[in-house]
């Protein structure tokens, strides 16, 4: 009889490893298959970019600069109770769509919005933040049965479209708000790293509030985060770096730590 231990992540939960080191030693030899090996085996997708963008005030003011509407993009808005959620989730979705362009039509069968950009292009935009169950199910059924690249241009989500969601034409993931969980970040990155014809580069961008700190401190914090994500994609056992980004609008009475910038 053979017993095999498999995990897609060393850091599930980001605080407690899936397996203790002494238990892991019982399963030898260990075989790792990381994201970079996966990319090397792809036919079309050859590179992955990971970066951070910053906003001041409300994130909606930076959406146009951070979002490339010529790329197939998955947008994750901040958690409902997150400090970057400046209004209700439905209003945030409406504001994002308004930054993309003007809604000129909607497919009632699938609840796909047709949005005209300022330069005249028509984009197909899906809203998975919608609470109406029949509407969500209709859209999800549509997403699960997409057969062409032109079926969707932009998808806006909140807590869905992460693990297990397959949109092979997705080129970019724009995630708004600080994500403390490396597991969540790697899950989201996985949404844009599917191999398909016509896609040579995938991009993950985290749009976060600009800290009230010196450029050097911000750079150090971002580099720590990028290193942690890179190590995670290599399937190394790492824990998420803990940085508390203080912005000008944060409560001044909020206690500081040596990881506050």
Where are these regions (language model features)?
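Short, solvent-exposed loop/turn and secondary-structure capping segments
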Residues: 15-18, 86-87, 166-167, 185-186
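The feature captures the C-terminal accessory region of ATP-dependent helicases
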Residues: 252-261
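Conserved C-terminal RecA-like helicase domain
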Residues: 51-163, 179-180
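A short acidic, often aromatic-flanked loop/helix-cap motif at beta-alpha or helix-coil junctions
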Residues: 35-43, 56-59, 131-137, 212-214
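Hydrophobic/aromatic beta-strand patches that form the interior of the parallel beta-sheet core
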Residues: 2-4, 31, 126, 174, ...
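A structural signal for short, well-ordered beta-strand segments and their strand-loop junctions
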Residues: 4-6, 74-76, 175
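Conserved RecA-like P-loop NTPase helicase motor core
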Residues: 131-242
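Post-DEXD/H (motif II) to motif III coupling segment of the RecA-like Helicase ATP-binding lobe
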Residues: 1-45
């Amino acid at each position: 009889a053979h017993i095999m231990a498999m995990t897609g992540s060393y850091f599930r939960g980001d605080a407690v490893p899936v397996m203790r080191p002494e238990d892991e030693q019982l399963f030898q030899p260990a075989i790792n298959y990381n994201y970079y090996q996966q990319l090397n085996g792809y036919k079309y997708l050859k590179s992955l970019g990971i970066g951070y963008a910053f906003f001041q005030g409300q994130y909606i003011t930076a959406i146009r600069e951070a979002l490339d509407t010529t790329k197939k993009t998955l947008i994750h808005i901040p958690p409902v109770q997150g400090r970057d959620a400046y209004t209700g989730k439905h209003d945030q979705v409406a504001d994002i769509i308004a930054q993309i362009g003007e809604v000129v039509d909607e497919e009632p069968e699938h609840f796909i919005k047709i949005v005209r950009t300022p330069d005249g292009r028509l984009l197909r935009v899906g809203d998975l933040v919608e609470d109406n169950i029949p509407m969500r199910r209709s859209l999800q059924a549509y997403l699960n049965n997409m057969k062409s690249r032109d079926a969707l241009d932009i998808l806006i989500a909140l807590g869905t479209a992460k693990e297990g969601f397959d949109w092979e034409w997705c080129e970019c993931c724009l995630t708004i708000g600080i994500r403390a969980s490396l597991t969540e970040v790697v899950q989201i990155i996985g949404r844009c790293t599917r191999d398909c014809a016509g896609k040579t580069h995938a991009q993950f961008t985290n749009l976060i509030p600009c800290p009230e700190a010196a450029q050097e401190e911000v750079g150090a914090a971002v580099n720590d985060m990028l290193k942690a994500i890179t190590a995670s994609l290599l399937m190394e056992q790492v824990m998420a770096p803990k940085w508390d980004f203080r912005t000008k609008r944060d409560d001044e009475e909020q206690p500081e730590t040596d990881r506050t910038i």
